Structures are given as structure tokens and as C-alpha cells.
Curated annotation (Swiss-Prot):
Record-given protein name: Chlorophyll a-b binding protein of LHCII type I, chloroplastic
Gene this chain is encoded by: cabII-1
Residues noted as binding chlorophyll b 3 in the record, renumbered to the chain: E160
Species this protein is from: Chlamydomonas reinhardtii
Transmembrane segments: 92-111, 139-159, 207-227
Positions of chlorophyll b 1 binding: W44
Amino acids binding chlorophyll a 5: K200, Q218
Amino acid sequence: MAFALASRKALQVTCKATGKKTAAKAAAPKSSGVEFYGPNRAKWLGPYSENATPAYLTGEFPGDYGWDTAGLSADPETFKRYRELELIHARWAMLGALGCQTPELLAKSGTKFGEAVWFKAGAQIFSEGGLDYLGNPSLVHAQNIVATSAVQVILMGLIEGYRVNGGPAGEGLDPLYPGESFDPLGLADDPDTFAELKVKEIKNGRLASFSMFGFFVQAIVTGKGPVQNLDDHLANPTVNNAFAFATKFTPSA
């Protein structure tokens, strides 16, 4: 009996202590060691910032590092519009960067599906055989540029209309983070995890946007895809680099 009472008392003490620890743990937000929101968030005060964060950048939104020397975010409505534009373009840039590199990588491994260089692939529609998706005529086969453009406009219009209107009628979903059927893995179920994923998304999206800009410049300057440009640079860094190509565009005496 004494053993049972002692065990019960010990169990009660343990449960109380565990409950306090659990409550304290639940109260503390999850963190990766760096704050991304609020006044104590990580900041990047770039040129002409006078080492001060504008009052209108409060750290409420993901990707806010406190730098806005041009005052682009001063007006709330303009800021809201720019946030939407940046995020949508960042997502397209991530898909685009992946799409620019994947065909070249597959072609290097021996996969044959027509033109692998991203800025040359579309021109295959003007060839005699037309454009075959992945080089397979049984998949998507395109020969008419007008019909292809019309289909793209219609499909993109439907998708954008769906997004802007918040998804299916009556659901009222967030046009930027709709969730539900757009999040089948439940990545946004936990609010703290979701908040951190928003930051990761916009950071990687900004990097992808710069990557796409670089791919465009490479296409104009070298006439090659990003993977081939990387291979050329690694093979001979002193000859194949940005500085060497830049000299070709400088006026000569």
C-alpha cells in the first residue's frame, strides 16, 4: 500500500512537471535559430539605407529584410500589389530555372527528345515535323504557332482567373497561399512551419529570378544553355567567364 501511494504521488509530481514543460514548450514558437518576422528579425540594410529600417517595414510579411531605399513599399496598396507580383513571378522563376536546366541534363545522360536548349526548343514548332513534347509524337504534338499560342492564353487565363478569384466559387481562399487542395502534403498545417516555409519560398524565388536573368544574358552572349555554359566554365575558367565575355561588348579604340 505504501509503495502504491508513493508511486501515485511520484506520478502526480511527474505529470505536473511534464505538463509545465509541455505548456512552456507549446508557448515557444518553433525556430531555426534565426528570426524572420518582427522587429528583431534578420535585416539586410543595403546601400543608401542610412542603416535604418523604414517604419512601414515591420517584419509582418515573409522576406522583409528592412531594405527599401526607393520607397516602393511605402504605400500599403502598392506594397500589397508588389508582394503578389513578386511571389507569383518568383514561383514561375523557380519552375523556369528547373525547366531550363533539366532537358540539358537529360540530354547529357543520353536521353533523346529533340532540342534540349531552352531558348531553341520553341523554334522546333516551325520545323517540318513540328514540335514533339519530349521528342515523342504520341504526347503533345504542335505544328501551328497560332493554335498553340491560343491554347496557352486560354489555359493561363483560366488558371489566373481561378487564382485571383480565390479558387472555386464560395471558398474564398487566399490568392497567394490557397492551401487545401493546393497543399496535398499538408505542409502548411503547422502555423510555425508554414511561416518559415513562406520565407524559404520567397528567398529561393528571388534567387531563381536572378538565375533566369542570368540564363537570358547567357543565351544572348554565348548562344548556349546554362548547363553547357557551366561545363565550358569549369573546363576553362580563365577563358569562359563573365569578365572575358564582357570585353567583347566594350568599345575599342
